[in-house]
Amino acid sequence: MEQRDYYELLEVSRNASDAEIKKAYRRLAMKYHPDRNPGDTSAEEKFKEIQKAYNILSDKQKRAAYDQFGHAGVDPSMGGGPGGFGGFGGFGDVFEDIFENIFSGGRGQGRQSRGQRGADLQFNVQLTLEEAAIGKEVEITVPRHGTCTVCEGSGAKKGTSPKTCETCQGMGQVRIQQGFFSIQQTCPTCHGEGKIISDPCASCHGQGRVRESKKINVKIPAGVDNGDRVRLSGEGEAGVHGGGSGDLYVQISLKKHAIFERHENDLHCEVPISFATAALGGSIEVPTLEGRVTLKIPAETQTGKVFRLRSKGMKSVRGYGQGDLLCKVVVETPVNLSREQKELLNKLQDSLENAKGTHSPKTSSWFAGVKKFFEDMKF
């Protein structure tokens, strides 16, 4: 199946800035999130495509590879790497060697071997709506590879240091001449590291990192929503042999609330009112995330009427603006009536039926429609 262009998926231009890409992702992820489109498989598939596109375009190295080679540059199944030639077996090294010579000015000496960057990690944190509204600082324990404190990440025994590999002169790769081709291969002596550790650290066994459980305090800003991520630079996996550490992404999810439903920064709720309050009007108390407020109900209010309370919703995670609280009133039908109450209601019903103009506009319109329906029917 043909893959869609990642820039097209995020609805941005190819020269879009990182901020524009992030803004587009947040908008589209919010629109197609499965929680907001229950049972909609097309929305779920769109959400997955948007996530994949953002994962590529938000990473500078992956974005550069995608800009140069398209999907083949970032999808291993289409070629096995940025060059897109991994699927050709042994010829992958041949073409890699050609590109190496082109982009290095024909020096033919390869790249200086350097440490490998640590992997990025993701940690999921679940918050209540109340916590998301005001922000929260949480302590998390992240299992990861951390830098070995004994050798300080070098992998060598304390007091010693790794030596440059004599076979590849620290390049991590060697060239082998086969006919007309000069093939570049991983150095068999240092296995691509460029250095030899003759006396490895006993604590990390020469890896420069060890398993640990790191406690980290995370400040989660007010206004976060499902799918938002907090990035902690350098708190991911430690790099190998001096490589930089990866990043930690704290993924936010919100617990379902008993009263409120969130739609972007607005909150929605249903408020039950009595038949008498709906007919005669009155005041009721409604809950907000900041406490109780009084809502005035005008006379002759119909069930389903929505009242908007300004700035009683969620704060914007960007630090400006606040959503509203939308209260939908539901007129309750009384139950478990006494004989006296039933008699009073019967009297009220008789009184209303004999009076004109007491039906709501919706009811009057419905009765008029039913009357016309029967008049037009031919039995």
UniProtKB/Swiss-Prot annotation:
Co-factor requirement: Zn(2+)
CXXCXGXG motif repeats: 148-155, 165-172, 187-194, 201-208
Binding site residues for Zn(2+) 1: 148, 151, 201, 204
Coiled coil: none
Protein's cellular compartments: Cytoplasm
Disulfide bonds: none
UniProt superkingdom: Bacteria
Record's keyword annotation contains Cytoplasm: yes
Pfam families: DnaJ (PF00226), DnaJ_C (PF01556), DnaJ_CXXCXGXG (PF00684)
MF annotations from Gene Ontology: ATP binding; heat shock protein binding; unfolded protein binding; zinc ion binding
Chief place where the protein resides: cytoplasm
Keyword hit for Chaperone: yes
UniProt: Zn(2+) 2 binding residues: 165, 168, 187, 190
Chain positions of all zinc fingers (CR-type): 135-213
Record domain J: where: 5-70
Function noted in UniProt: Participates actively in the response to hyperosmotic and heat shock by preventing the aggregation of stress-denatured proteins and by disaggregating proteins, also in an autonomous, DnaK-independent fashion. Unfolded proteins bind initially to DnaJ; upon interaction with the DnaJ-bound protein, DnaK hydrolyzes its bound ATP, resulting in the formation of a stable complex. GrpE releases ADP from DnaK; ATP binding to DnaK triggers the release of the substrate protein, thus completing the reaction cycle.
Domain comment, as recorded: The J domain is necessary and sufficient to stimulate DnaK ATPase activity. Zinc center 1 plays an important role in the autonomous, DnaK-independent chaperone activity of DnaJ. Zinc center 2 is essential for interaction with DnaK and for DnaJ activity.
Subunit-level organization: Homodimer.
NCBIfam families xrefs: DnaJ_bact (TIGR02349), PRK10767.1 (NF008035)
Protein name: Chaperone protein DnaJ
Gene giving rise to this polypeptide: dnaJ
